[in-house]
C-alpha cells in the first residue's frame, strides 16, 4: 500500500510540473531515438555495401554472361551437379536429386525464396539435317551443322518470344507427348541464323559414348555405342530480355542448344539413352530485403551446412557461391564494426543528451527541494524519496521508448541520407525496418536516461528541513568532480595521448599501436578530442567563478555599474547553481566548433584529393593509332615489317572534344616517363614523370585543384611561369633544392618512352611541391621526381605526339557515359574515364563516412536544440529562485531599470563566457587534432596535406540560436520583474 501511495504521489508531482516533465521526456526520447536508429542505419548502409560488393564480385560474371553492365544480380544461391562426361545421370536420378533439393535444401535457406529456376542439360549431340532437310544444304551430309545439348529450364515460356512455329509437345498449349509421335524440339534464333534451320525441319542427332561392360566375372572392356535420334524443329525462339537475372545460363548458350519439355525428355529420350544428364543447376533467388545484421550469420552458417549436406548426397553436387558466402561474411564483420563505430561516434551526442537530462532533473529536484525536506521531516525515508524518483524515471523511460522507437526511423533516414555535414542527398534513403538489436539498444538508452534522472535525487533524498535551509543559505560548495580533481586526472592521459599523436602520428597503449590505418574506422582519433574537451571544459569551469570575481572587483568602484557588479558577484559566489548549464554550453559549443570544422576539412580534403588526381572535372585516357599495327605471325597477306621506320601515333584533332555535349573546355596532359640528369650531366636512375600540358587551358580547368599551399607562391603564378618561354620547366621543389638548380638554368630530361627516347633540354622556370595528376595519389610521392612543361614544345622536340590525357571542364549535369560514347563516335580511342563528381559522390556514400557525417550532423542539430532549450529553462527557473534576492534589492532601493540590468547581466555574462570558452576550446581542438586524422590513413590520402578549415558559419548558427533563447529569457524575466513586488518576491523566494 505504501508503494502504491508513493507511486501516485510521484505521478502527481510529474503532472504538477508539466513543462519540466516534458523537457525530461524530450531528452530521454532523443537518446532512445538515436540508440535505436544506429542499428537500423547500419543495416541499411551495409545492405547497400553488400549490393555493391556482390556487384563487384560478379562483375566478371556479368562480362562472361554478356549482360549489360548495369544489370542487378540478385542475392542467389546456386547448387549445381557437373558430371563432366563421366558421372552422367539418368532421368530418374535427376528426379531424385530434384526431390532432395525441393525437400531438404529450398525450405532451409534461412531467407524467403523469391524465385526458383531449375536447369538440366545433356552432353552435346552432333546435329545434322535429316530426310528432306538435307537437300537445302550444299554440304556433305556427314558434316554436322553444329553441336548442341538437349536441355530444359523452368519458367522458360515467360521469358521468350516465338519467332515462328509452335511450342514442342509437352509444353502448355502444345500437343501432348505420345510414345509413337515425333520427338519435338525448338531452337534459338542465333542457331537458326547460323545454320539455316527453320521451324518444321527434321534434324538428326548423333552421339557416341564409350561405356565399360563386363566380359566375365573378372574382366571388363570398353564398348563404343552410337545413339541416333530424329527430331522435328517446331519453333524458333528468342529471349525477351537478355539482361534479365532469370537467365542462370547465358541466353546465347541456350540459343545454340535444343530445348524440349521435361515430359518429352522422360518419355522419349530416356528410353533411347539411359544416362545422359551431365549438368543440372538449381538457382534460388532470395529476398535480400530480409537480410539484416541479425540473420546474416545464420544465412552463412546455413549455406555452409547445406553445402555439406548436398555433398553427402552426391559428391558432384556443390554450392557454387563461394564469392557470395565471402561477401556475406564481410557484410557480417563490417556490420558489427560499424555498429561499434557508430555508437562511439554518437557518444558525444549521448553525453550531451544525458547532461541535458541531468540538468533538467536537477531543476526538477530543486523545484521540489522544499517538499522533499518536509517529507523527510515527517518520516519519509531516503529510500522512499529514491523510490518516487525511480518511479518517475521508469514511467518517463517507458513513454520515451514508445515515442522514440518510431522516431528512430527518421533519425536513421537522416543518417543514411547525409552526404556531408548538414547536407543530404536529393534522393533520401528512407529506412523502413528496425533490426531486433534496435529495440534492445532503445531499452538500454531509456534505462540509462532514467538512471540519469536519479543522480540529483541522491543528495536531495538525504536532506532534512534543517539541511535544506542551510543549503539555500549559501551555494558556494564545490561539485564532487572538483573536490576529486577529476578534471585534472582526466586531462593527464589526454595530454599524453595528444603528445603521442602529434609526435608519432599514432596512439600506443602499453607498447601496442591501437590506431587504425583508416581514420574513418578509428574511433580513438575521434574520441580523444571529445575526452580532451571534457577535461578542458571541466578544468575551465573551475576558473569561471574566479573570472567573474575578478570582473566584479574591477567594476565594484564604478557607481553606474553597480547592477553589473552585483550580478558578477553573485555568479562568483554561487558556481554550484549554474555549473550544469555552464558545462552544457561549453560542451555544445566546443563539440560543435570541432565537429563542424572536422567535417568541413574532411569534405574539402576529399574534393581536393580527387581534383588533384584528375586535374579537372573529367579526365579521359586516350591513345592514338600506331603506324605499326601488331602483326599476327603465320597469317599470309601482311606487309613486311620495316624495322627502320620509327613508330608514331596518329591522333584525331583534339579540338573535336569541344563538339562533345557537356565539355566546356579541354587541355592535353601527357604523362611521360623521364629520367633527370643532375648537375654533372649524369642521368638520375630514379623513375620520374613529366607532365606536358596546354598551359592556358589547363590552368583554367585545374583551378579547383590548385591550392596556394601547394608551393611557396600562389599556384596560379607558378603555372603562369610556363608562359615566359616555350621551353620553361617547373621542377619539384625538393628536387630543385637537392640538385642545386637555379631559375633560368638549363636542365636535361631523358625521355623514357620507347617511341621517342632521347634527351630534351628545358629551362628551369620555377618550383612546386604538389601538382595535379603527377603528384597526386596515383604517383609515388615519396620517391618520384615530377616535372611540368609545355606540351607543344615537348612534342615538337620529340618530333611526334605521345599518348596524352584529356582534362576537361564539364557541365555538372552532363552524363559521363554519354560523353565517352560521343568521343568514341568522333574517332577518339578512349580506354578509360575518370569523373571527379562521380568519385566524390561514391566516396561520400561510404557507410563509415556517412555514419561519421550523419552523426556529426545529427549531433549538431540535437545538441544545439537541447542546449538552447536547457539553457532557457535554467535561466527562467534560476530567475524564480533569485526572486527573494530581487525583492531584497528592490527593497534596498534599486530601481526597476537597475534590477533589469542585474537580470540581464547574470544571464548575458553566463551565456557569453560559456559560449566563448566552448568556442575557444573547439577551435584549439580543431588545430590540434584535425591534422592528426591524416597521419596514418590509407583511405585519407597523404597528398594533399590537410588544411584545417574552421566552419564559422555553422558555429554562428548556434550563437544565433543562443541569442534568440537569451532574448526570449530576458524578455520573459523582465516581464515577470515588472509585475513583481518586494513582499511578493520574498514570499515567492521562501516557497
Predicted regions and their residues:
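Interfacial "coupling" helices/loops that link adjacent transmembrane helices in transporter permeases
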Residues: 17, 355-397, 463, 468-480, ...
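Small-residue-rich transmembrane alpha-helices
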Residues: 358-361, 370, 394-426, 436-465, ...
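N-terminal Sec/SRP start-transfer signal
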Residues: 1-35, 471-492, 541-589, 878, ...
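Selective detector of the "anchor" transmembrane alpha-helix that sits immediately C-terminal
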Residues: 341-363, 444-448, 855-876, 959-964
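Membrane-interface segments at loop-to-transmembrane junctions
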Residues: 382, 386, 390, 427-435, ...
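C-terminal transmembrane helical bundles of large multi-pass transporters
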Residues: 582, 804-806, 829-922, 926-931, ...
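Membrane transport/envelope proteins' first extracytoplasmic loop
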Residues: 1-353, 363, 417-425, 429-432, ...
